[in-house]
A protein has these predicted regions:
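Conserved ATP-binding subdomain of kinase catalytic cores across diverse folds
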Residues: 1-23
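Activation of the activation-loop gatekeeper triad in protein kinase-fold domains
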Residues: 17, 77-82
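AlphaC helix of the protein kinase catalytic domain
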Residues: 22-33
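Catalytic-loop of the protein kinase fold
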Residues: 53-63, 68
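Conserved protein kinase catalytic/activation segment
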Residues: 65-77
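Regulatory N- and C-terminal appendages and interdomain linkers associated
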Residues: 74, 104-156
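Active-site activation/catalytic loop segments of kinase-like enzymes and analogous catalytic loops
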Residues: 84-115
Length: 156
């Protein structure tokens, strides 16, 4: 996570990742070697585990919200952060974060079962895996959210 320097109202000034010539690219624009992919995947999962251990879920994690610079990663964009005990859809949101991370890293050659990994991390922190999606937490315009809702309706 970039180091925060100042805060005013709903804005936080944070550390710049990059150099004078360019900002760090998002991981979504980077093709990793197999040797690079696994350690970076492990680093992302470590960060997810640390967040969860501090009662936080990123809420919108994907390769678009991870910066890549000089062989390292930095998670960014935290306005959707969720408390796992306070949000009825916390498990589904966490599962979505882990699944998106796994989708990117699978394309980079890393073997990953997003659902299994998310459940392991989730339950290791004392949370229960739930099957229900709280419809108030879904975006009707988002095809991924509609798919989640449809899948849940079929399962009933």
């Amino acid at each position: 996570v970039p180091k925060p320097y100042a805060m005013l109202k709903n804005s936080i000034m944070m550390e710049y990742i990059g150099d004078a010539g360019s900002a760090a690219p998002t991981l979504s624009t980077v093709r990793l070697t197999r040797d690079e992919a696994r350690p970076l995947f492990d680093r992302v999962i470590l960060n997810l585990n640390l967040l969860l251990g501090n009662q936080r879920i990123h809420g919108d994690l994907s390769a678009y919200n991870i910066l890549y610079w000089e062989g390292d990663i930095t998670l960014i964009d935290f306005p959707q952060v969720v408390h796992p005990e306070a949000n009825p859809s916390a498990w589904i949101i966490f599962l979505r974060d882990v699944t998106r991370v796994c989708q990117y890293f699978k394309a980079q050659g890393v073997k990953c079962d997003g659902r299994k990994l998310a459940a392991e991390l989730w339950t290791a922190h004392g949370h229960k895996v739930v099957k229900e999606v709280d419809p108030s937490q879904l975006d009707a315009e988002d095809p991924k959210d509609r798919k989640l809702w449809e899948k849940q309706k079929v399962g009933k």
